């Protein structure tokens, strides 16, 4: 057995880890799907639980020696149920995509019709995109946003549901900044005999604390990731109140699409759920929303347009067409200035997904650092400076302005440090 520490045994990997730690410390993370986990979550994920194979479920394993991994999985399950007020939870999905696959398979066989939000309008790959399993093994029909309000077009959802009679309607998105009306989705599902699957991956942390309406009791199945606003390890989870669906979900996860669960990740999920049950986490999610509103307001003051006119959650989609610049160029310029985000298509974007006409911004990670509204207003002003420089330079950006902004980013990062003891 190799007993050397990582630095001495594999300095190349250690160097990359050190560089990534430096990046996280010295850049302001604005990618809406990312967050910063606690040392306790990292300790659980980096524990000896990684050594244990545990096919099956607690007390029903196909391997011996599962007494202690059973404890952490039961803790994760019970805490998830408490957190979201539901009867059943499966914490084994390795990702949100696998959670969605199992949820769909638990309801409808291959070839069935599903109705989900178009990727081009803010949906997720797994909601029916042609390049994804959901658009290949299912007959996927896509709804979108109202052209004027840029909110979910429920008239279109209803019309498509009546026409295609889907087995599943999917509610949820990856780039949608407004509250989702689950009751309206339920009404449409009931009218056509469809099951409602809510993918709350992006806003699960807000749901946990009442900062976003809960999908329950409207949803038949709820899927989520365990990172993003929930601030846990990267992974997935499936929730339901239906006992029969719970049994089907379990069998679709194992042995359906996965083998052994990642017990070290499940241990980290359990820790994150305990954190999310604390009063401090509610304060955190409230601040996430306040910060998003503050950031959006400053961007609008700076002449940028927010898709749908604002935000109700943790993210916003910034339309750059008025500046005649691309999301790709803007993403690169912001990163050079120490502000990390991602290019993102806007509704009906004429540019390719690799170029785009927008960027997506989110507040969860920087809020974890301690950023408040004042700090996010400062961040917003920095973003506007960089965007204006990209526009003035025909997309190239201005190295001098980026360097000036980076100094101010450094000052904010020093004011709100992370991982000081690592």
Curated annotation (Swiss-Prot):
Cofactor(s) of this protein: pyridoxal 5'-phosphate
Family annotation (InterPro entries): PyrdxlP-dep_Trfase, PyrdxlP-dep_Trfase_major, PyrdxlP-dep_Trfase_small, Ser_HO-MeTrfase, Ser_HO-MeTrfase-like, Ser_HO-MeTrfase_PLP_BS, SHMT-like_dom
Broad enzyme group: transferase
This protein's GO CC annotations: cytosol
Modified residues (N6-(pyridoxal phosphate)lysine): 228
Binding-site residues for (6S)-5,6,7,8-tetrahydrofolate, renumbered to this chain: 119, 123-125, 244, 352-354
EC annotation from Swiss-Prot or TrEMBL: 2.1.2.1
GO biological process annotation, one example: tetrahydrofolate interconversion
Pathway membership, UniProt: One-carbon metabolism; tetrahydrofolate interconversion; Amino-acid biosynthesis; glycine biosynthesis; glycine from L-serine: step 1/1
GO MF annotation: an example: glycine hydroxymethyltransferase activity
Residues marked Plays an important role in substrate specificity (site): 227
UniProt catalytic activity: (6R)-5,10-methylene-5,6,7,8-tetrahydrofolate + glycine + H2O = (6S)-5,6,7,8-tetrahydrofolate + L-serine
HAMAP family referenced in this protein's UniProt entry, alphabetically: SHMT
Annotated function: Catalyzes the reversible interconversion of serine and glycine with tetrahydrofolate (THF) serving as the one-carbon carrier. This reaction serves as the major source of one-carbon groups required for the biosynthesis of purines, thymidylate, methionine, and other important biomolecules. Also exhibits THF-independent aldolase activity toward beta-hydroxyamino acids, producing glycine and aldehydes, via a retro-aldol mechanism.
Assembly mode: Homodimer.
PANTHER family listed in its UniProt record: SERINE HYDROXYMETHYLTRANSFERASE, SERINE HYDROXYMETHYLTRANSFERASE 1
Similarity comment: family membership: Belongs to the SHMT family.
Protein name: Serine hydroxymethyltransferase
